[in-house]
C-alpha cells in the first residue's frame, strides 16, 4: 500500500526553508531544540484564535528572534502593543535569553494550508456538512490563484458508525515534483462523535532556481500600487 512522504520534509533545502535557522555546538543543540519546541507549543496555545500559520525561530548571538506569521496581526499585537510585550517576556523566560518578536501578516489566508485546515476543522466542530466545508475551501483557494488544491477528511464523517476517508481535489497537486511549491498542513476537529482529521495540500506553482529564488522572493518588498496612466488630454 503506497504511503505519502511529508511534502515539506522532502523539499527542505530544495524549495522549502527550515522553520528554525541557527547553529549550535553539540552541548547546546539539545537545549536549543527543546527551547524551540516549548516556545512553539506556548505560542500556539496562547494564540489559538489568532490564525497563526507558522512560527520561525532564529538565534543570533545569545538571543532568540521569533517571527509569527498570522492572518490577524491585530490580535497578536494587542492594544498599544501590550499583548506582544507579554509574549516577548514569556518567550524570553522559556528560552532563557533575551527575546525579540516580529509579526508577519499572511496576505492571503485562503492560500495557506494551515489556515485552510483550521478553518475546515472549526466548521466541522460547528456541525457544518463536511462536503460543503471542503468544497468551499477548494473554491476559495482556486479563485485566489492556486494552481491546485486537495483536501482530505478522515474519521466518523457525519456521525457514521464506521470511520472512513473522503477527499476532494481541483487542479494539479504534483507531489513527486521537487521544484513544486506545495504547502501542506493538518488539523483536528474534535466533534461529539470523535476526532476528525483534516489534511490540506495546496500547489502554488513551480519554483525555478531553488533556495536562491525562494530567498530572493522573501526579501522583495510588497509591490507598490501602480499609478494609472495619465490621459493625453484634448487634441
From Swiss-Prot:
Query: Known SUPFAM superfamilies for this protein?
Result: Prokaryotic type KH domain (KH-domain type II), Ribosomal protein S3 C-terminal domain
Per UniProt, residues of the KH type-2 domain are 39-107
Q: Name one GO molecular function term.
A: mRNA binding
What job does the chain carry out?
Binds the lower part of the 30S subunit head. Binds mRNA in the 70S ribosome, positioning it for translation.
Q: How does it assemble?
A: Part of the 30S ribosomal subunit. Forms a tight complex with proteins S10 and S14.
Homology family: Belongs to the universal ribosomal protein uS3 family.
This protein's name: Small ribosomal subunit protein uS3
Amino acid at each position: 500500500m503506497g504511503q505519502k512522504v511529508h511534502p515539506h520534509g522532502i523539499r527542505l533545502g530544495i524549495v522549502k526553508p527550515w522553520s528554525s535557522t541557527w547553529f549550535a555546538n553539540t552541548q547546546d543543540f539539545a537545549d536549543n531544540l527543546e527551547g524551540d519546541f516549548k516556545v512553539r507549543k506556548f505560542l500556539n496555545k496562547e494564540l489559538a484564535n489568532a490564525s497563526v500559520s507558522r512560527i520561525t525561530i532564529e538565534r543570533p548571538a545569545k538571543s532568540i528572534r521569533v517571527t509569527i506569521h498570522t492572518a490577524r496581526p491585530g490580535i497578536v499585537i494587542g492594544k498599544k502593543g501590550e499583548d506582544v510585550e507579554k509574549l516577548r517576556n514569556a518567550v524570553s523566560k522559556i528560552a532563557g535569553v533575551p527575546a525579540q518578536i516580529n509579526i508577519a501578516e499572511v496576505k492571503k489566508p485562503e492560500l495557506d494550508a494551515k489556515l485552510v485546515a483550521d478553518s475546515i476543522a472549526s466548521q466541522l466542530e460547528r456541525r457544518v456538512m463536511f462536503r460543503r466545508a471542503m468544497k468551499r475551501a477548494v473554491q476559495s483557494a482556486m479563485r485566489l490563484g492556486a494552481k491546485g488544491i486537495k483536501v482530505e477528511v478522515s474519521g466518523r464523517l457525519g456521525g457514521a458508525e464506521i470511520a472512513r476517508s473522503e477527499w476532494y481535489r481541483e487542479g494539479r497537486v504534483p507531489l513527486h515534483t521537487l521544484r513544486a511549491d506545495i504547502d501542506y498542513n493538518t488539523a483536528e476537529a474534535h466533534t461529539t462523535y470523535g476526532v476528525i482529521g483534516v489534511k490540506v495540500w495546496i500547489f502554488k506553482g513551480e519554483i525555478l532556481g531553488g533556495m536562491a529564488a525562494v530567498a530572493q522572493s522573501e526579501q522583495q518588498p510588497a509591490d507598490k500600487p501602480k499609478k494609472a496612466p495619465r490621459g493625453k488630454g484634448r487634441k
